[in-house]
């Protein structure tokens, strides 16, 4: 008798689906690598090589109708919703500030911020690692790069959290969003604070991203706001998600934490990439089909939406040995957590730096931590980012002192 494969419930725009999607991901990769979602009327692509194939063929799979499912963002001017050559032209405006060499110049600043964070946390003996650790570092670093005043970092964090999480809470085709007012309020606050900064940078430019955009003669304020929000969300929220998840997962996998303590060089070689593959903070992105064609025997038509399932692709056994296990010694692979091709995450090198420095200092200063309540950490239901709302931890209060 042949094995009967259970067909899971798959709704690619249901936030609840992404709380624990891994059984469904396995089924999709094995049985329906190009899956038609009959509820949401779009395609899901789950295998690693297929995600890369879509990401690297912008002619056939366009970003110009928007990067989020069922939302027409063709009028938005952010680079994430553009195809080449327009996308590359806009990206090139700030790309020099995100090269590996440019990012390395920020390491001392990032370490100073991490030290400041841990100086506050370590004496407490317990904390919510999401609020006290994970959310602070990227909000401060990205806020500084953009040009927000340092005392505005909590606003930066709140804007990114609300926009990323609230906009992914409910299917756009489902009932009216119960959170519309909170999302609108966050956007109004972001606009009210940012527009005066843009006007100030036009009068007196500084060494920050707002100045780079504000002084472009062909850019209006709306375009500057679009790009600012993109960098703020991508830079603050995804790094927060990765750090928070890894604090939790290293508490549950002490053997992996011991490896990092015994071989700290792993954070320089393999561990950070494995963290990012394992967490895959961004759940999906959308592309729009520009011409009729077939993929794995399925007929895709012009205008169809395709959702790239990064978390499924990053656990594809066709690419990774034992992909369902966290292995900080894993040889570097081509994970797609940052996307791939032309739209590869602009801030990837900065995210890697922040994650590496955070865990170098965290493991040095408070090497032993445990979950305060193993049942507490909960994934926030979302169709965009897979993040924990809270990760309570406990740790000894006689830590290694900060670096002098």
Briefly describe each language-model feature range.
Residues 1-404:
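Cytochrome P450
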């Amino acid at each position: 008798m042949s094995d009967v494969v259970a067909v899971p419930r798959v709704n690619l725009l249901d936030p609840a689906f992404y709380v624990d999607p891994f059984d469904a991901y396995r089924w999709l990769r094995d049985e329906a690598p190009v899956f038609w979602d009959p509820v949401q009327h779009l395609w899901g692509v789950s295998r690693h090589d297929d995600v890369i194939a879509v990401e690297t063929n912008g002619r056939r799979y366009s970003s110009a109708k928007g990067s989020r499912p069922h939302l027409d963002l063709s009028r938005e001017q952010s680079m994430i919703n553009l195809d080449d050559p327009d996308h590359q032209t806009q990206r090139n405006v700030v790309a020099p500030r995100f090269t590996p060499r440019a990012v390395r110049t920020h390491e001392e600043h990032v370490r100073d911020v991490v030290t400041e964070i841990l100086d506050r946390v370590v004496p407490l003996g317990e904390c919510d690692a999401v609020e006290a650790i994970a959310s602070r570092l990227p909000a401060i670093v990205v806020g500084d790069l953009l040009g927000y005043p340092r005392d505005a970092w909590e606003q930066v964090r709140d804007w990114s959290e609300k926009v990323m999480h609230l906009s992914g809470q409910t299917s756009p085709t489902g009932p009216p969003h119960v959170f519309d007012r909170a999302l609108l309020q966050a956007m109004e606050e972001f606009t009210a604070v940012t527009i005066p900064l843009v006007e100030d940078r036009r009068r007196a430019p500084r060494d920050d991203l707002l100045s780079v955009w504000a002084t472009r003669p062909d850019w209006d304020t709306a375009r500057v706001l679009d790009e600012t929000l993109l960098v703020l969300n991508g830079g603050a929220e995804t790094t927060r998600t990765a750090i928070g998840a890894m604090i939790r997962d290293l508490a549950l996998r002490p053997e992996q934490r011991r490896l990092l303590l015994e071989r700290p060089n792993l954070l320089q070689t393999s561990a950070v990439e494995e963290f990012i593959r394992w967490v895959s903070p961004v759940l999906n992105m959308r592309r729009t089909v520009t011409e009729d064609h077939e993929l794995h025997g399925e007929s895709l038509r012009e205008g169809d939406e395709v959702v790239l399932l990064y978390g499924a692709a990053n656990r594809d056994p066709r690419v990774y040995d034992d992909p369902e296990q966290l292995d900080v010694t894993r040889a570097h692979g081509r994970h797609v957590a940052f996307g791939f091709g032309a739209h590869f995450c602009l801030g990837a090198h900065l995210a890697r730096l922040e994650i590496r420095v955070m865990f170098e200092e965290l493991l040095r200063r408070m090497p032993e931590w445990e979950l305060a309540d193993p049942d507490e950490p909960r994934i926030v239901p979302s169709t965009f980012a897979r993040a924990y709302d809270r990760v309570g931890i406990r740790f000894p209060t006689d830590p290694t002192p900060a670096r002098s």
